[in-house]
Amino acid sequence: MSLKSYSTPTYWQRVKVACQYLFPQLPITRLAGWLAEQKWGMVTHFIIRIFAKQYNVNLAEAEKTNPADYTTFNEFFLRPLKENARPINQDDQAVCLPADGKISELGQINENRLLQAKGHYFTLETLLANDEEMAESFKNGSFITTYLSPRDYHRVHMPCDATLKKMIYVPGDLFSVNSFLAEHIPNLFARNERVICEFETAFGPMVQILVGATITASISTVWAGIINPPRSKDVVEYNYQTTGETAIHLKKGDEMGAFRLGSTVINLFPQATVELVSHLQAGVETRMGERFAKIIK
């Protein structure tokens, strides 16, 4: 069965897609990262105010509500929220959304195929950097893809209690990851730069993937700090002890990583371990900490 199933794009849609291929992704992303770290005083505050107004950012829920309290754009973008701004569902069987944003797609993995958008599919193997053992664990499992827009809170949290087993940095493209491009660029999430985090949980393995994008200057985790930059040209794998004093245990709702400018989070679950909440569907806005699945194993 073919992995491609695309609608015929219009002329202007083809132009938009072509621009993504021609766009100098890495230089622009590096420039954006540099600019976001500059301390320009009133200029920085003015830019933050314009950005917050343009994207309707809710600063009332942030610890710092005044744009003048941020010294850099990145500090604003990584703003922590007030305590209890995102209550975590405490039901032991609840699996919670890892980030604010919007659901791009969710559902069952068909053998090794995941839905990208409207008939676009990609495989576990390509997404997981050809780690066949990891891919095998999630065949016929469940997945959810969450898109973080520029307005959203950009720290990423744990959907359940887990212990870190492996992290893989995968170099790649930096295509934008909005819904339009997800419908028109084949294998988008499997082509973009990403950080794959594999965890052990009470119901088996779980993967949480932080996918990079245009102007996503860096991806970080709480245990390793900033993963990129610098950007390796090779896949880099890190393995962790899951027992003993050096093991990294994280609780449901704990922060695990962050983006500096928006992108996408993908979660994978093994077959017959979780049941997705029936009312969730593509396009639904999400709040970190809300239940999106129930543990059934």
From Swiss-Prot:
Pathway: Phospholipid metabolism; phosphatidylethanolamine biosynthesis; phosphatidylethanolamine from CDP-diacylglycerol: step 2/2. It is a peripheral membrane protein. InterPro entries: PS_Dcarbxylase, PSD-B, PSD_type1_pro. The active site is at D100 (charge relay system), H157 (charge relay system), S263 (charge relay system), S263 (schiff-base intermediate with substrate). The record marks G262, S263 as: Cleavage (non-hydrolytic). Keywords: Cell membrane, Decarboxylase, Lipid biosynthesis, Lipid metabolism, Lyase, Membrane, Phospholipid biosynthesis, Phospholipid metabolism, Pyruvate, Zymogen. It is found in: Cell membrane. Its cofactor is pyruvate. Binds 1 pyruvoyl group covalently per subunit. Pfam families: PS_Dcarbxylase. NCBIfam families: PS_decarb (TIGR00163). This is Phosphatidylserine decarboxylase proenzyme. It comes from Haemophilus ducreyi (strain 35000HP / ATCC 700724). The gene is psd.
